[in-house]
Amino acid sequence: TFYTRLLQDPRLTPELCATMRLFVSGSAPMLVDTHTQWQARTGHTILERYGMTETNMNTSNPYDGARRPGTVGMPLPGIELRIMDNAQEVAQGDIGTIEVRGPNVFKGYWKMPEKTAEELRPDGWFITGDLGQIDAEGYVSIVGRGKDLIITGGFNVYPKEVESLIDEIDGVLESAVIGLPHPDFGEAVVAVVVPSDPALTAEVVQAAAAQKLAKFKQPKQILLLSELPRNTMGKVQKKELRNIYATLFT
């Protein structure tokens, strides 16, 4: 969020950032477009990594070496990371739930034994709840949160894929894709879009999505808002959006 907001400021130049040593990102997956724009505007390549309260840092792109846009790098020394689905490790490149194990992982939730048992395996693996995949060279990509996965008509839709496409449309500042209850499909894909151009219409977004997305991935509804709800850390609150629009199709 901070990077996208700074990119909107014309004062952001290579000269302004000349004395900066390093820019990092790790609170939420960064779009490739944001990463690329930042490098072009400032001359700095953002170092993206992946961590959470329960584990501190899990992975990082290298300080010296290739920092790959769209990835959070590789597991840090001493930390194991695997991608799981239905208690089985998935094949390379497949999407599943990220689990981590190492000295960085917490002991459990304070006075919450049930939650601890649900998310921390007896052998030390922590179930992060994040969806991800690992490429052939070991770089990890975050696809989204498991709870944000949309199942529509029996098909899985990963919101980040749809958001990445929508965010590339001219006139779009940012977007959030959610699943809402639907009488026919179980869940319907809905895109909440913040325009950067007041002339942007829902029809333009819908047409662009129809060109590049499979039918089941295309939003059934496009909602235009002036801003997305966020918490104090700047993370988009999709739960709040789901609550606000829960009855959109019912």
Describe the role of every protein-language-model region.
Residues 3, 7-68, 80, 87:
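Gly/Ser/Thr-rich phosphate-binding loop
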Residues 11, 19, 43, 78, ...:
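Glycine-centered tight turns that cap/initiate beta-strands
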Residues 27, 51, 73, 130, ...:
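Active-site glycine-centered loops adjacent to acidic/histidine catalytic or metal-binding residues
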Residues 47-54, 73-75, 178-181, 223:
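Beta-strand->loop->alpha-helix junctions that form or flank phosphate-binding loops
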Residues 66, 70-76, 120-123:
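Short Gly/Pro-enriched turn/cap motifs at secondary-structure boundaries
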Residues 74-78, 88-119, 157:
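Conserved ATP/PPi-binding loop(s) of AMP-dependent carboxylate-activating enzymes
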Residues 102, 107-108, 115-118, 131-217, ...:
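AMP-binding/adenylate-forming catalytic core of the ANL superfamily
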Residues 243-250:
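Acidic/polar alpha-helix N-cap and adjacent early helical turns
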